[in-house]
Structure formats: structure tokens, C-alpha cells
Amino acid sequence: MKKTIITLLLILLATYTFAQFKCNDILQFGNLKSEASHAFTSRQSGVYKGGLNETARRMLPKEVPSYDGGTLAFRMKVDPAKQNYFTVRCFGSEKDKSMLMLFSEGKQVGYRHLGDIDLLSLGNGEAPIAGRYYYVTLPIPLKHTIGKKEVNLEIRSYGEIWGYGETFESYQKNMVDPTLGIYKAYTHTEPCFVPNKDEKQGVVPELKIRKTPGVEVLDALKNRVNNELNDIMAKTTPLSQLEMWFLADAYSVTWTPVYQNRNVASQIIFSIDDFYKRFLNDSSLVYSDKQVYNNEWLITGPISRAIRKLWKQLEPFADRTFDNGKGQLITHRKAWAELMQASLKYSTTHRRQYTNQSMIIDMFMYDCNKALALLDPKNALPEYQTLKYLHESIGLTPWLGRETLKGPEKPLGDNYLQLTHKGLTKELGFVGYYGEVLDWVVDIYKSTCVPGFPSTGDAQIREQLLKMMRTRSYFRYPSQDENGYRAMRIEAVVGWRDASHYPGNITYGDRAIAWDATPLMTAATTLDSCAVGMAQQMINDNQFFNMVDKKLEMKGIRVTKSLLHIPDEYEVIMKQKPANFQLPMTKGMPDFVFSDEEDGVIAVKNGDEILYVSLYWRARNAVNNLAKVHYITPTIDRIANLYIKTDFEDSGLRYVRPNWVNLAFSSGREWYKGINSAHEGDILPIAKIPDGIKYKIGDENSFAGKCNFYRMQYGNYVVGMNCTKDKTYQLSLPVSVKQTFNLSENKKLVKEKSIKVAPMSTVVLYVVK
């Protein structure tokens, strides 16, 4: 196959002008005349009257259950010389859990999971913007339209996917329900789709505060926790690691049935001893315990937590002996110390790069070492060493990787930080919901506290936690909950590791419904005024009880354990004075531009408009010149993949896109036989890799796809982002415009033809046509 350069010089070298938006073609689904004029055919689809009494088509599941469902095929007009885009119109009150993929000339556009060219839709069962329409835009492969006036397109439907599935059956679910409706399809050359004024649009309703549920959910919470604790205490068999941790944590909670219960210590001693006996038969148990999810990360961290929590109760028994299962007597102290040492040896040599994984591994490593210091101080690592690992994992000092016989591996060199200077996680760029790690950093901070004294933790970790929290606050946008009440949601559309997070989860400060998180944990732990303000905003919107109620629907011991401290945290926050802080995107708050040049992401509040953009977008292997946009207005939402202009230092190396259609980053799960990628053979340039960094073409690498400068024009917005530390770039203004305002400088009127963009800074302009 002839290889195609995707840098698209025709597009990137074009003069930036503002022209009246015009569609090349419009297809109205359910309108027989419109469908006939587009050579429309379908399989397993139906027409219905949907939002605002408009006609739509939705794809239906097959009569015999299958992972794939209905299809819509059609032909549309395109521009033969320019980059063309395809947009669909969907109604925001509709919800599904289906996946919709675009096909062009019989080949799949984009990837099914975390691709730089995204899928059309992956529903999460929630309505994203009730009562209004939203538009999703993808680029049509240039090689399918160059020199042509028409292109054959198709939308195919599939069941939902679970991104962590290791088999096709666990990854790809059958399609059992109809998809959301597709109302219209459009082709156009301007990346920011502008609907015709005649199209019906909804409006944001006046959002009310929900009245229920209320404080009664805390009673339900206590019932669940206490019932599970009673079940654990009634066991005559050894407890799992997570049960030990839960029990030890509950020992100091006054409203539980195990509060200062003497039998707790004996249960835990019996259970750790049993774990040790199994460890003697299989030393890998410290990192392969099947009762612990992500066992390689947690190691024997839960046991170490139990030891630390209850050391005052356990120490009197530490030097007593028990039978190790092989007819030999050993003290509890010696046996448990062996477990901690084995865990330390494994975790120090198996550290991981991705931020949340690094944090979890290093946190439980730290806990194991603290437990070892209680049991056998002479064999514990120095406190400064394990604390250094924590500092590395949260971006206070450079992350140096796993330990080797020659010292730290340093796979990313000497200066790679896990967080940006402004406090965002990097995987490799901006991470939305998946990158929300405040709960883990709170847990890390608590691990450094003296047990029973919550404000004695490492001061640098606390300060980093608060920086992260304030930065994350820009990525909460005003919306409504599933019942139409006022709520703030997390921005994840432009996140590298996020799929099916539109709409984002209801979030104010902490991730309310993550397994190990609570809605108020940062605020209750730090009592920082901004954190308390976020917590109070959540409580005032009555979303706190709603989130607790939702968490009660979740199953699993880690969820139940996380419920343990919610009542006390709520009591602490209710005692605080009103804080003078609201989330920045809250209606009525001042306009702003936030940018993070290391992650290549911006968040803009401009009156009633909100713009989120990842300019550095899923460029794992090479420069792709792609951005992802979530543009929120009072009447519509827009989600778009678009090509932008970049400047970078070319390594001379090239990455050729393989024929992958599932994961954009791996061939490991290519289960969709007979489907070919529309991007196979596309050639992408690779940015210069710093000296000393191990790299081969095709590797995921934080330097391979990162550019020095990004320039994006999207609708009325023009963005220039300078990611260098020592270069200055010029951002040219579009021609043929009336006025230009610099949003980065309080909407200052721009009179120059270009603006300097200083190192590590971003300029956002708003152009009036």
C-alpha cells in the first residue's frame, strides 16, 4: 500500500482566515428524500421522533444477540482539496451504552479504545446535556477525499466495551439495546461545526437544587459497614488482606461494633500468620494474592496497614511463637518481618511509570517499610529512602524508576517529573477522570502521619496535594445530574486515558465514587479553605448525599471500607465556617484562561462559554498534529477531533501506522477480524528524543509526539501554546476579522498582526468575525 504522509502540508501551510461556515453536505436521517439522495442503506435500524420532535435513526441489536448491531451507510459530498470533517447531531437527553464507529470507504476511522483519532460515541448510560443537542466531529481520512467530490461513509454499532478485558468476551459485550439516535450528519472543512440557525436547539433550564436524599443515607451507610464488620468478626477462617485492613481501620471508629474490640487483634494475628504459612509455600504470594485486585501494586500493603494501625494492640503478642505449618516455631515478629522484606524487595524493583500506579506502589511500599521498622528496625530501609519514593511519585522530585543492581534505572532520564509544575498528572498528556488521584495523595499523606495524629504528615506532600486540588478545580464544569438538578461534573472528554466519560462524573473536589475515595477526604484531612469551599459547594448543591447514595449501590470490600470515615468527615466539614471559594467554572465566577504547557491542555471560561482543549493529544509514538476539543455553550456542546498546526524538532525518524483497529497503542487485542484501519500506512514524524533515553520506533514515549509549539483555530478561538523553555514564538492573527481580544490578558483588544508567545506560556484569542 502506498504510504501517506499525514502532516497534511496543504492544510498546515494554509493561511488562517475566517470564512462563513458552510457545509459540503447534510443528511437528515429519517427523511426519506434526504436519505435517498445520499444512496442511503441500513441494516437493523429504526426511525423515530426524538428530541424537540425531530426525526432520527437509531441502530438496533440483532435478533440473535451479537457484539455488533445495526449499520447506516451513505454517500456524502466532500471538498476534493481540503481536509474534510464529518459531524453527527445527537440529542443530549438520550443515553445508551453502545459504541459507534465511523467507516470511510469500507475502512474503520479511528480506534475503539483510547485512539488519537477517536470513536464517534461510547455511551456510559447517562444523558450528557438533557434537553439540548450536541455535535461530534471526526476528521475524514484525507487520502479518501483528495481529488474526489464524494466519499462513502458508514456508521456501525457495537455493544459496550470494558477496557481492561483480557479476552474478547470480557472486553466486548453484546449489543442488547438500541443506540442513541443520529439526527443529522454533515461534511465540512472548518473543524468547528456551526449549526444552521434554522436548526432547533434547546436551552439550559434553570437548575434547581435537589431535595433528596438527605442525612438518612448516613444511617444506611453505617448499617452496611456494621453488617460487613459483623460478618468479618464472625468468621472462623483466616481473613483476606483487605478484611484485615478494614477491621484494623474500623477499630478506632466509635460508631462501629469493633470499636476497641479486643477480639480484633486476635483475628488479625491469626490471619497474618496464615498468610505467612501460605507465603512459605509460594513466595510470590506477596505480589500475586488473588484476593487483592491489582495485587502487584498493593503487595502486602493492606497487612502492613493493619500492623501500623493496631501496633499498640499487636506488640504485646509480637514475640510469641506459632507453628509455621512446617513443624517449626517462629515468632510473629520474625514471620511478619519476612513478609514486609519480601514486599519491599519486589516493589522497589517493580516501580511503574504511570502516575496513579507509581503512587499506589510507592505508598504501600512505604507502609511495608514502616511496619518493618516496628517489627525489625535494623532491616528496614532508611525513612528518607522510602519517603523519597513518595516524593518521586507525586512529582516533588524526578522519578527515577525501579531499582537495579546498578542503581535507579532512569528510563526517562534524570529530570522526569510525574506531575507538571502546575500540578496535573501526566500519562503522557492530560488525564481526566483516570488522572484524578487526589484520593491517593490524601492516602499517601495520611501514611506519613503518626497513627492517631492526622496533621503530622509530610508538609511537602500536603502542599503538593493542595496544589493538585486547586489545579484540578479548573476541570469541573456546571451541568446537571441524572434527575436534572444542579451539579458540577468532571471534564474527561479531552483526557488521554478516558473513555465513556461523557458526561463526566459528578465531582467537586475528590472523586466521590472511586473505590477508595470519599467525597470530602481532601477537605476533611487538610481543612484548607479552597478544599472546604469545594466541599461546601457540593453539600449546598445537595450532591454530597446523592454521591454517598450512589456509592452505596457499589459492591466490594474496598468500597465498604471507604465508607468508614464519611460520617466523621461530614461532621468535620459541617463545623467549618463558610469558605470564600467556589469552583472556577461555576456560573457567575470570573472569566479565566488556565493552561498547562507540560500536559498541552487548556481550560477557558469566557462568559457563558467553556472551552477545554488537549493540544498534545494521545501522541504516544509520534507527532500526529491532532487536538481534542470539548466546547460548551448555553445551547449546544461540541466534541471534536481536529488537525492543528505544530512546530517541533524533527528527529528524522518516522512511525508508520499499523493496521490496528482496536487499541491505538497495542496489537495485543486485535480481535475484530475482517476490519481494516483507514490509517494503515500513514507516516508520522517523530520528535527528537533526548540523549540518554532508551527508545525504538513504535515505543510509547513522552518525547516522541510532543511539540514545541501548537497553533489551533477553532471557531472564534485561536490558541498558541509554547511548550519550550527558551524559545519565543509568534502567533499570527487571522485575517478578515473585525476585532480580536486576548483572553489571556483580561480580554485586551489586540491591534497587532501577531502576538509573542513566551516560553512555557499560552495565548488564547477570541476573534469577532
Where are these regions (language model features)?
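Bacterial Sec-dependent N-terminal signal peptides
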Residues: 1-20
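Extracytoplasmic
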Residues: 20-207
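Extended polysaccharide-engagement surfaces of secreted carbohydrate-active enzymes
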Residues: 73, 452-743, 758
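Solvent-exposed beta-hairpin/edge-strand motifs
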Residues: 95-104, 735-750
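Solvent-exposed beta-strand/loop surfaces of large extracellular or lumenal domains
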Residues: 110-128, 698, 739-754
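N-terminal module-boundary/linker segments of secreted carbohydrate-active enzymes
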Residues: 204-224
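Aromatic-lined, polymer-binding surfaces characteristic
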Residues: 226, 230-461
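C-terminal beta-strand-rich structural cap/linker in extracellular carbohydrate-active enzymes
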Residues: 710, 718, 751-769
